[in-house]
Amino acid sequence: MEVNPPKQEHLLALKVMRLTKPTLFTNIPVTCEEKDLPGDLFNQLMRDDPSTVNGAEVLMLGEMLTLPQNFGNIFLGETFSSYISVHNDSNQVVKDILVKADLQTSSQRLNLSASNAAVAELKPDCCIDDVIHHEVKEIGTHILVCAVSYTTQAGEKMYFRKFFKFQVLKPLDVKTKFYNAESDLSSVTDEVFLEAQIQNMTTSPMFMEKVSLEPSIMYNVTELNSVSQAGECVSTFGSRAYLQPMDTRQYLYCLKPKNEFAEKAGIIKGVTVIGKLDIVWKTNLGERGRLQTSQLQRMAPGYGDVRLSLEAIPDTVNLEEPFHITCKITNCSERTMDLVLEMCNTNSIHWCGISGRQLGKLHPSSSLCLALTLLSSVQGLQSISGLRLTDTFLKRTYEYDDIAQVCVVSSAIKVES
C-alpha cells in the first residue's frame, strides 16, 4: 500500500502587505435629548471619546488616523507600494535566501525587486524586509508573484511562492471633442478647439493639480481655462479645484498650426496627431496619481485641390462704392495647375475688373495672393459669391460661393476705416 509522504513545512514565512496612506477616523455620534432616560450619559461618553473634536462631538469629525482595514482599490496612474517580509520561524540558520517579486499584467511581466542578490544567511527570529513601488499603467487584473528560495542546514534547496491578485480600476473617464474654428476671413481655418471632458470615476474627491495638453510638433496650444480679473489670471473653476465623485469638468484648448506648417499646403490634412493630455491629481492625504492619454487624432477638414481663403476684408462698406478684398489661393494637390479666374456677378454683389484672366502656373503646396475689387448694390448683410477657378490642364472648374459676408450701409453713413 502506497502512502503519500507528509507535506514538508517551510522554515520561512512570507508576508505581503500593501502600503497606503491612513485615513481620518470618524465616529458615529449617538446622542439624545436631555429629558430622555439616558440623560447626559451619551453626551458625556462622546466628550470623553479621544477620537472626537472638543466642541464638535456630533459632527463626525476626527483628529486621529486609522490604518487601512482592507486592501482597498487601486486606480490607473497611482503608485502601487507593497511591504514584503520574509521571517525565519525555525530554530536553525537558513542560507542563500533569495526573494523575488514580479508583477504579471495582461501584457507583460515586470521585476519589482530592489535587489536580485541572495542573502548569505538568516538567523532564527530574523527577517528580510523589502519595499517595492510600481506606477500602475494598465487596467485589469494584476498578479503579484512573490518567490522565495533558500538552503537549509542540511544542504537541501527549498522553494515556494505566493500569488496576490488585484484589480486596477479606471479613475477617470476622459472624452474629447474637436471643433473647427470659424472665422470672418475664411469659412474654415486651421485653428481647432479641443474640449476635454474629465469625469471622476472614484468614490472620493480629487484635487486636480494639473490638466494640460502637450501638443504635437505641428501645433501651438493656448489654454482657455482661465480669465483675467483685476490683472490676475483666475481659473474658471474657482480657487478650489476639487472634483467630486462622478462629477464632470470641461477643459478647453485652442490649437493653431505653427508657421512653418501652416504655410505649406497639404501638410495638415487627413488624420493628424494633435497631442496628448497630461492629468495629475491628488486624493486623500496627498496621494498622487498621473494619467497620460494616447495621442489624440483628428480628421483635418478637406480643402480639395485648391483652397481659397480671405486674407483681408472690411467689416462694413458703403452702398454702391467699391471696396477691396485680398484672396489667397493655395494649391493643395500634388500637381502643377494653370489657373484662370472668372468672376460672376450676383443680384447684390458686382465684381470690378477683368473676368477670365490668366493667373499662371501654381506649383504644389504654393500660394498666391490676389487683390480684388467689388461693390454692392443692396444694403444689409451680403454674402460674397461668384468666384470660379478653372484648371486648364484638366479642364476642371472649382466654384467658390458664400466666401464671406459684409455689411452694406447707406453712403450717407460714414464708415470707419
From Swiss-Prot:
- Disulfide topology: none
The biological processes this protein is annotated with in GO are:
endoplasmic reticulum to Golgi vesicle-mediated transport; vesicle coating; vesicle tethering
Record-linked InterPro entries = TRAPPC13 (IPR010378), TRAPPC13_C (IPR055428), TRAPPC13_M (IPR055429), TRAPPC13_N (IPR055427)
Please, which domain of life does this record's source organism belong to?
Eukaryota
Gene Ontology CC annotation, any one: cytoplasm
Pfam families reported in the protein's UniProt record: TRAPPC13_C (PF23643), TRAPPC13_M (PF23647), TRAPPC13_N (PF06159)
Its family remark reads: Belongs to the TRAPPC13 family.
**How does this protein assemble?**
Part of the multisubunit TRAPP (transport protein particle) complex.
- PANTHER family of this UniProt entry? TRAFFICKING PROTEIN PARTICLE COMPLEX SUBUNIT 13
What this protein is called in its record is Trafficking protein particle complex subunit 13
Source species of the chain: Homo sapiens (Human)
Q: What is the lineage of its organism?
A: Eukaryota, Metazoa, Chordata, Craniata, Vertebrata
